[in-house]
Amino acid sequence: MKLARRLSVVEPSPTLAVSAKAAKLKAAGVDVVNMANNHALDYGPKGMQDTFNAIASSKLPVVGIGHNAAEAYRPYRTVIHGQRIAIFGALDWLEPALIPAWSATDTQPGVAMSIDRTRLVAAVRAVRPEVDTLVVFLHWGTEETYCASPEQQDLARTLLAAGADIVVGSHAHRVFGAGKVGTALVAYGLGNFVYWREDGESGRSGVLLVTATGREVDTYSWVPARITNGVPVPETGGPAAADVTEWQRRRTCSGLAP
């Protein structure tokens, strides 16, 4: 999704949001948004500039896009209960023909990419000594699957080796399982959240809750929901328990431990 109003369309699709939505997200309590996704430049450079303007006026912190590479690969930083936290955002899935025009470079606005891992890995390594907990949020994976590909698993391990403590992602429109790789946490897919489809697997949603102390992930859990009229509604009782059990089961095919 992008926050724009000009309609110089690269890819006709229902991915345009009015700029006021940025302020609404901030008012709702959203701390930071990963804007690196495969629709970020559907409306071209003018649409991206409108997105920058909307972000600036709302003061909503975002990661994963920027006026240049330094900005796009810059993490959001905050301190919670004395713990220094950094959150990166990047895109790992895009049609190859679009990559040059969409990638943030030293002289070009655009999206942070992990397709070429070099810059993202370097950014993670550079920030690692300065924070207690480091999170990377990726837009990645194959749509309508719920098992991580070998490429995803390799990228997750690469980022963990570079210093990430938590790797989280989305894009497949499916809820993946989550689990440990060593002492780190990986959640390959959080599914849909606010979305127009609500049937079957597309309607499976939820919130991943994680507590961490420094580099140690203390607890993690899944609060399941079902999308109803476009928004997630928390589940209760038997349906909630069944969805949590399925979420736990799905970690196995992605090579994750409890």
Label every model-predicted segment.
Residues 29-258:
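Acidic, metal/ion-coordinating pockets
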Residues 1-28:
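Conserved N-terminal helix/loop that builds the PLP phosphate-binding region
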